[in-house]
Amino acid sequence: MDDADKSCSPSLDHSDINDPMIVAVESLDTSKKRKLHAEESDLLPLPKHFCSEHQASLVNSSCPSSVIDYAECSYAMENTKTSDEASSSASFTGPSLYMFKDSIYSTGSSSSGYAATSSIEQCFSKVDHKTQEDTQDFTHMEFIYHDSEFAVEDLQEVLNPVESYILSSARWSVSNQDSKEATTKPTIDQEFEQYFSTLMM
């Protein structure tokens, strides 16, 4: 260290160790990588009460509630992840939590592990409940379709009028309009197909 650095930072000797001002100044050394609590709060996810207030404001918006529930669940999983990381940051032998939708496995014992798994199970049950409600909503589409003006028979009549017939080869339809089209010369493919169809008979 050069002389300027020595003059800026106070030195600790055994007589000054009980002085709280010197200890406080030493703990605020800016060259260290340790982050202050205010800096860490920007990196942490939003508190849960903020998410619930935000959800209440989104009730009248166009965002479906299943998306909001999914966002809450992902927040709960992130919160669980950060709390597990904080508890095992001292060593890598701390409890780790592996979560799946149908089953939850925990290696090691942790009091927060049960709370985390129960909150995640609740989130998955909310999302499953919403998807079941959505599928029930689509079952009514069958009745709406039958009441519409375009039924299956109507669509078939539009696509294939009563006077037109489809050949067995299903390449083109034959109708009364073919007499008008007979004046036009058939394409080479049509001539080829007609020639071989007569040979096969």
UniProtKB/Swiss-Prot annotation:
Chief location bin: nucleus
CC terms in the record's Gene Ontology section: cytoplasm; nuclear speck; nucleus
Induction: Activated by FHY3/FAR1 under far-red light (FR); HY5 prevents this activation. Down-regulated by FR, red (R) and blue (B) lights.
Entry's Gene Ontology BP terms: maintenance of protein location in nucleus; positive regulation of DNA-templated transcription; regulatory ncRNA-mediated heterochromatin formation; response to blue light; response to far red light
Keywords: Cytoplasm, Nucleus, Phosphoprotein, Transcription, Transcription regulation
PTM section of the record: Inactivated by rapid reversible PHYA-mediated phosphorylation.
Keyword Transmembrane: no
GO molecular function: protein homodimerization activity
Top-level taxon of the source organism: Eukaryota
Motif (Nuclear localization sequence (NLS)): 32-35
Motif Nuclear export sequence (NES) location, chain numbering: 43-46
Consequence of gene disruption: Partially blind to far-red (FR). Impaired inhibition of hypocotyl elongation and cotyledons expansion under continuous FR light conditions. In plants lacking FHY1 and FHL, altered phototropism (e.g. phototropic bending) associated with abnormal consitutive cytosolic localization of PHYA. In the double mutant fhl fhy1 several PHYA-dependent phototropic responses are altered (e.g.
Subcellular location: Nucleus; Cytoplasm
Quaternary assembly: Homodimer and heterodimer with FHY1. Interacts with PHYA, especially upon far-red (FR) light illumination. Binds to LAF1 and HFR1.
Protein's job: Can activate transcription. Essential for light-regulated PHYA nuclear accumulation and subsequent PHYA phototropic signaling processes. PHYA-specific signal transducer in response to continuous FR lights. Mediates the association of PHYA with HFR1 and LAF1 in the nucleus in response to FR conditions. Contributes to inhibition of hypocotyl elongation in continuous blue light (B).
Family from the record: Belongs to the FHY1 protein family.
Protein name: Protein FAR-RED-ELONGATED HYPOCOTYL 1-LIKE
Gene: FHL
